[in-house]
UniProtKB/Swiss-Prot annotation:
Enzyme Commission no: 5.4.99.12
Assigned keywords, A-Z: Isomerase, tRNA processing
Record keyword Iron-sulfur present: no
Protein's gene: truA
SS bond list: none
Active site: D51 (nucleophile)
Protein name: tRNA pseudouridine synthase A
Enzyme kind, highest EC tier: isomerase
A biological process term (GO) from this entry: tRNA pseudouridine synthesis
CDD domains, per database record: PseudoU_synth_EcTruA
Isomerase is among the record's keywords: yes
Length: 261
């Protein structure tokens, strides 16, 4: 039997998603909890791998098991064995052909940036921070250049293992709620560090160092060395994974609720 799970986690206390020799990754915590409940060793496959410090509101995984449990029992049982920073949101039996990674046709990320003179204390590790005032309109204009199909090499980490830097950006926007800014991205897939590198470039535009067309120039150059530094992982959230309705999964997108009454 193959099961799909929706997962939420706080990445601040983990060495990223992917299993590590020190067993301090989110995947390690989840597999340990599932193995205890299933009574056998469980290995999961995820829709995407997040880096150290990156969070998820809607990660999707699948695994195979012969253990018989109700979907509610899987959720409640696994959550009792997980550390505080990881929770299973839902469980669903799926077709044995379903694959959390390869059947995903798009992924969504949000970046929460607090723009104020002093670094936040309560939200440390949960949001990025920038001390200089940022021009929201300039960043909004710049993000329009990201839409569509592009070679995103200028925003690609050196260690990225993706076969191609060409991706399709379906949505890119930024909104402000008081001192908070939310950068919202949806694409067919993302390169390693792509969102953090795009946010880094947008912040440079927002503080007035470059005009909005700088994004178009970076895309044309296809050279990571021409782009501003990678931004902090603290405010980055995996918020959604898109699947065809034929798989019958529950809602797989959960947005940040900043500024919503």
């Amino acid at each position: 039997m193959r099961l799909a799970l929706g997962i939420e986690y706080d990445g601040a206390g983990f060495c990223g998603w992917q299993s590590q020799p020190n067993r301090l990754a989110v995947q390690d915590a989840l597999e340990s909890a599932l193995s205890q409940l299933a009574g056998h060793q469980v290995r999961v496959s995820a829709a995407g791998r997040t880096d150290t410090g990156v969070h998820a509101l809607s990660q999707v995984v699948h695994f195979d098991t012969e253990a018989v449990r109700s979907q509610t029992a899987w959720v409640r049982g696994v959550n009792t064995k997980l550390p505080r920073g990881v929770r299973v949101l839902w469980a669903k039996e799926v077709d044995p052909r379903f694959h959390a990674r390869f059947d995903a046709y798009q992924r969504s990320y949000q970046y929460w940036l607090i723009n104020q003179p002093v670094a936040p204390a309560v939200m440390a590790g949960k949001a990025g921070w920038f001390h200089q005032p940022l021009d929201l309109q300039a960043m909004q204009e710049a993000m329009a250049y990201l839409l569509g199909q592009h070679d995103f090499s200028a925003f690609r980490a050196a260690e990225c293992q993706a076969k191609s830097p060409v991706k399709t950006m379906h949505h890119a926007s930024v909104s402000a709620f008081g001192s908070s800014m939310i950068f919202d991205f949806c694409a067919s897939a993302f390169l390693h560090h792509q969102v953090r590198n795009m946010v880094g470039a947008l912040v440079y535009i927002g503080k007035g160092k470059y005009p909005p067309v700088f994004i178009a120039e970076l895309l044309e150059k296809r050279d990571r060395r021409c782009s501003p530094p990678t931004f902090s992982p603290d405010g980055l959230y995996l918020t959604g994974v898109g699947y065809d309705g034929c798989w019958g999964l529950p809602g797989t997108e959960r947005k940040l609720q900043i500024g919503i009454a």
